[in-house]
Amino acid sequence: MRNIALKLMYNGTAYHGWQMQRTEASVQETLQRGLSMVCGERVRLTGVGRTDAGVHAERYVANFRTSSRIPIDRLPFAVTTPTPEDIVVREALEVADDFNAIGSCLKKEYTYRIYNSRIKNPFYVNRAYFYPKKLDEAVMDAAARAFEGTHDFRAVRSVGTETKTTVRTVHYCRVTRRGELLELKVCADGFLYNMVRAITGTVLYAAEGKLTAEDIPKILDSGDRTLAGPTVPPGGLYMTRLWYEDERLND
């Protein structure tokens, strides 16, 4: 059996997240259906993470096993026809037999985008969080940096998925501005349910003067979700970078 890794990108607006659902469309199920047609057998994808409903991915890796002999360079083009245009396979690669998209991932980066303007932009609907009041990116960046390091992140997660530990290491958490678009980029060895969206909501609270960067370590220590900011909408969230030992998967 071949072990094949796929480098994907997708617009998550029409999907109820990555993971298969009983009644809702998911990215995993949709792509599996197309791959099964191309490979001539049923395939099962393993994804690098469970993006939620409405969340996008500029970079995403999934792998599957197949006995199909389709040439690896033809696979991305072959799967285009049976797959909707909001899911794209950028590249397919033969990988080691023990490779697993989620288990082999070293760290991930998510980006949350905020459209900060008095007037809405239709091209950012479901692709960035519209926030009409002027935001100070320096205040937001200071608050974001307070999340860096190894902490218990219970205070910025939603109850949902069970996990052995809520301790994670955030390698960087920064806010930058490009015109009217603000971006919060956070890289960690793993993420809790809704963690990035809750961090973003807390950083927005700092910009609104509801808390300060100095309050954030105390909020994390408390483990109290009610002390942090709200969980912002999913449309502004993107998976944007991944790291693997197999460097072919890192671009």
Predicted regions and their residues:
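Structured-RNA-binding interfaces characteristic of tRNA pseudouridine synthases
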Residues: M1-D251
